[in-house]
Regions:
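A conserved acidic beta->alpha catalytic loop
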Residues: 36-45, 94
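Acceptor/aglycone-binding surface of glycosyltransferases and processive sugar-polymer synthases
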Residues: 58, 62-81, 98-180, 207-222
Length: 251
């Protein structure tokens, strides 16, 4: 099974070399693809050095900060074009433990089309989070799942493994969201297509080095888009119901 790991980066100079080393130890044959948004702290240069030293690493240098969704769209398209079997996405700041990846790959081999590293299934959780952040994240995920009608407990986790054919089938290159709303948009598409989504427990550890990319603007954007998608979904359901009843009355 050929695995590719897509790693969006922006100012992760304190983390990138150590993460690439750990990934190479956990997944000796995987292809590692770094998508760097012209990090001022030299993240891209460090990734290039690792590529020369370790092999099996590609680095895409983008001209500026273009967002998480954009980075994943470009990264997914690149690795899918290489004919890989599984695509893994994850954060670079060690919030996501590379040692969990084998369990995610095992779930893919067992028949899942997508596997989410989940904070909100039995055995999962968070570490070093203040209470307000835990409550906000939990509420946000409950709201997202309820509004969008998806049976996923952690819609916003970026730690995932996708069967490459399943990922390609939902056309991620046509998604519109940026920021963390992009992750929810993928969950919606997977669910609407009837693909099998499973969740494995993870302990999400707050970053020790670097600066978080999360902001109030990103959270607001995510909630607004989720609400918009939910309204559109309910409207389409209502229209379908009316159309069915109309046909029944005519028959």
């Amino acid at each position: 099974m050929l695995v590719a790991v897509v790693l969006p980066t922006y100012n992760e100079s304190e983390n990138i070399a150590r993460l690439l080393t750990q990934l190479r130890n956990v997944l000796p044959d995987a292809r590692l693809f770094v998508v760097d948004d012209n990090s001022p702290d030299g993240t891209g240069d460090i990734a290039e050095r690792c590529a020369r030293e370790m092999g099996g690493i590609e680095v895409l240098h983008r001209p500026g900060k273009q967002g998480l969704g954009s980075a994943y769209r470009q990264g997914f398209a690149h690795v899918i074009s290489q004919g890989v079997d599984v695509v893994v996405s994850m954060d670079v700041d060690f919030s996501h433990d590379p040692l969990v990846i084998p369990a995610m790959l095992a779930a893919i081999e067992a028949g899942s089309d997508a596997v989410i590293g989940s904070r909100y299934v039995n055995g999962g959780g968070t570490k070093n989070w203040p209470i307000h952040r835990r409550l906000l994240s939990r509420w946000g995920n409950l709201y997202t799942a309820s509004v969008l009608g998806v049976k996923v407990r952690d819609c916003t986790s970026g730690f995932r493994a996708y069967r490459a054919t399943a990922l390609a089938s939902i056309a991620p290159e046509t998604t519109k969201a940026e920021g963390y709303a992009f992750l929810s948009e993928l969950v919606v598409r997977l669910s609407r297509r009837g693909l099998k989504i499973s969740e494995v427990p993870i302990l999400f550890v707050d970053r020790e080095n670097g600066t978080s990319k999360m902001s109030g603007r990103i959270i607001a954007e995510s909630m607004l888009l989720v609400t918009r998608w939910g309204v559109a979904h309910r409207w389409n359901q209502a229209k379908s119901f009316v159309q069915v009843k109309t046909r029944e009355r005519k028959s």
